[in-house]
């Protein structure tokens, strides 16, 4: 009993984590982000369908040691939503991340990405390695691995059927905020997701796939360069969209160390399915 009371008193004595909103200008496109904490910069990039709030637990875990900035990707929530698939080209998505880092007065950051945020993070590291201190990827294989599996693995081709549907011109018309929030299991979070998706552009979400996802006939491709930056990959093995065989060979495409954490009971949204384990894995890896 005394231990429980002491724990409550200690928790009450700890300062609450303060979340602050901000906006960066990326060539005329307003990018919303939320920051917490002070220290080395950690930029966190969500995927589909999601928004900055997906990182809430990791932000609280990291804020005592780091300044964490979680981005709303263009098209989502409080960020601008330019029309036209050309405005969701990967080079512009990379520029958005750079704009946030520079807006916060930094030259580089630890970059964390999940799903589309992971795809952007890989490409950011390829094209702007000088701005990446470390790279953390959740449930998005190295581009070499994903393209190989799309070209050769019938199971991954079947698993990617949703992406082919998303690439069609009218795919956004079938989406609603409630449908997009269907994956959210936290009852307290679901209304926040529905509200955020109500502010988002469904067409913009689909433009990520129309502009950047590989199209049939699939071909194995090679990334523009090898990375010489430490990489942590965390992958929920119950992911039905991005299958784990795509992880094989990642170590052959990196010149720095790779740490791979697989979580058997987590699905695609590993940062929420296994929130504590993901947070502890990231903190432990960063504090090596």
What are these regions (language model features)?
Residues 27, 39, 74, 264-266:
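Short, solvent-exposed coil/turn elements at secondary-structure transition points
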Residues 266-275, 279:
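Catalytic histidine-centered segment of alpha/beta-hydrolase-like enzymes
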Residues 17, 29-31, 69, 76-112, ...:
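Flexible "cap/lid" subdomain of the alpha/beta-hydrolase fold that forms the substrate-access gate
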